[in-house]
């Protein structure tokens, strides 16, 4: 649910994008004077801040046996659950040891289950990608660190927030749906 207090808080931190920021950036990049709202959130480019969005979703989980028994359309499997919540601060979260642990463990899980070749040649990374300058720097650093450590030369990275905005509580669901297609 989009609440006014969320807008006020993000704006107070300077994390929200604004028409003025968009207009200034478009002028700097020579993108014309008419505001192009499709470029409002730029997670990996010239960052202006996040856009609040709204979504919801659900996933039905079942064992392999049950899925085959009922003829379910199997879209993926859960290898492991690696999570880190660092939003307990009164400022924009920066990467801590938990962030590195979660991402590193995920790389290890993919390599262990699917092998080195799949990890290096057939993987993609759906980033949190809020569109704030701090997120771009910290998230890019974490992903680059592990890609290098695991010998990955090219790792496609994307974020759905450039199209959906930051949907807060359901942002992880958006990313899951993006991964499953």
Describe the residue ranges of each PLM region.
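Acyl-CoA/ACP chain-elongation machinery
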Residues: 1-51, 81-95, 129-136, 153-181
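Glycine-rich, phosphate-binding/catalytic loops in enzymes
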Residues: 10-13, 76-77, 141-144
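Condensing-enzyme catalytic core mediating Claisen C-C bond formation in acyl metabolism
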Residues: 22-118, 123-124
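Buried hydrophobic packing segments
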Residues: 60-63, 106, 143, 173-180
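An N-terminal domain-start capping segment
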Residues: 98, 121-140
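Surface-exposed alpha-helical interface segments used for non-catalytic interactions
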Residues: 99-101, 141, 174
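Alpha-helix capping/termination and helix-coil
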Residues: 107-114, 129, 133, 147-151, ...
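Glycine- and aromatic-enriched membrane alpha-helices
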Residues: 136-154
